[in-house]
Amino acid sequence: MKLIVAAVGTRMPDWVETAWDDYAKRLPADCALELREIKPEPRTSGKTPAQMMAAEARRIEAALPAGALRIALDERGRDLTTVGLSQQLEKWRGEGRDVAFLVGGPDGLDAQLKASCGGLIRLSSLTLPHPMVRVLLSEQLYRAWAILTNHPYHRA
């Protein structure tokens, strides 16, 4: 199984890339974590937010492997505990599908793209900056794997 994070935005600060790389390399090959950065639509194009999100949605869809289960990160998504995420990860592993986590741009994700997803989750009730979302998501996916494998990283 591959865990793919398709995130709108490029040119993250070095600390984001360092943290992402650290968690990604900790995961084993059978639960690989991969980042696919999606070019954001220019905010100076004169397009409406809906048009910009639709353009970004097309780029996201083009970056996803066929058959991957899509999970959108959204402020209105379902709250998951860390243990709940590990249980969900175990279920996805059992299905044998790649899982793609979709992270929108400044305006969020296109409504049609969200509707095509197998689920919506949120990392927090707080508003998080996009660089933090990448770090938190990668850490939580690693922690979920650690719970499943009884790795000492997670001590609850």
Swiss-Prot record:
Intracellular or extracellular location(s): Cytoplasm
Domain of life (superkingdom): Bacteria
Transmembrane helix listed as a keyword: no
UniProt entry keywords in alphabetical sequence: Cytoplasm, Methyltransferase, rRNA processing, S-adenosyl-L-methionine, Transferase
Catalytic activity, EC: 2.1.1.177
SUPFAM superfamilies: alpha/beta knot
Family matches, as InterPro entries: Alpha/beta_knot_MTases, RlmH-like, tRNA_m1G_MTases_N
Primary location group: cytoplasm
One GO CC annotation: cytoplasm
Binding site for S-adenosyl-L-methionine: 73, 104, 123-128
GO molecular function: rRNA (pseudouridine-N3-)-methyltransferase activity
Catalytic activity: pseudouridine(1915) in 23S rRNA + S-adenosyl-L-methionine = N(3)-methylpseudouridine(1915) in 23S rRNA + S-adenosyl-L-homocysteine + H(+)
Role of this protein: Specifically methylates the pseudouridine at position 1915 (m3Psi1915) in 23S rRNA.
Annotated family: Belongs to the RNA methyltransferase RlmH family.
Known partners and oligomeric status: Homodimer.
Protein name: Ribosomal RNA large subunit methyltransferase H
Organism, scientific name: Bordetella avium (strain 197N)
